[in-house]
Amino acid sequence: MKTSAFLTDSTLCIGCKACEVACKEWNEVPPDFTEWRGLSYDNTWALSARTWRHVMFVEGIPEIGKGGNDPATMAWGLLSDVCKHCEVAGCLEACPAGALVRTEFNSVYLQPDVCNGCGYCVVSCPFGVVAKDAVDGRAFKCTFCYDRQKADLTPACAKVCPTQSIQFGELEELRDRAHQRITTLRDRGISDASIYDPLDTSVAGTHAIFIVRGEQKAYNLPPNPEVPTTHLRSAWTSAAVAAGALLVGTLIAFLGAGGRKV
């Protein structure tokens, strides 16, 4: 199985939002409900059922070679967020309708014609990516441009990115490229750059790798994303063990009682 992936490098992002526009245009996604919230200069604010690529503006990244809390040293951290297409996908495991499937590119695809709008995938996503449309009622998320990949084309967002902040390719190749990029950044004096690739977590890695500066959680990248069904499996295992022990205990007590004369 071919494993496609994104590498999104925040140090190259200029905040142009061309990826957002290309995603909406190619996938014919309706306009989102934009509003000024006072939290950022970004009016789309977050990923949603109608925003599958979202360029976030994170305030407070120090300039290269400077530090401290001086406002003159502050700058914007820009990152194009997207569905992570987790190796162990909580949304896929929680869906009772079979609307979410694993494709031949190892991405997670949500079939809108199968979705029943139950919302289990929404609460099962550790990244808050999957969302229900307020008008339609069904869930939607990034498709990884499945139709374009089948035609051997690059996903729309990566195709239009003018700075190569969004790169598309084989997962392992992009992992190597990310580590090479970190080495280059540190050679240039950018010591706070890091790779977000949560391999040793319950999602077992993602097919969207990120390079960010500063705290990763500031970019909606949790340090330990958890798949809810992982805990559910553990609970069922514990319950089965307890039930088995109870059954054995009951059987022993019954046989013991049967051997005594009344």
Description of each model-found segment:
Residues M1-V262:
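Non-ligating segments of multi-cofactor redox enzymes
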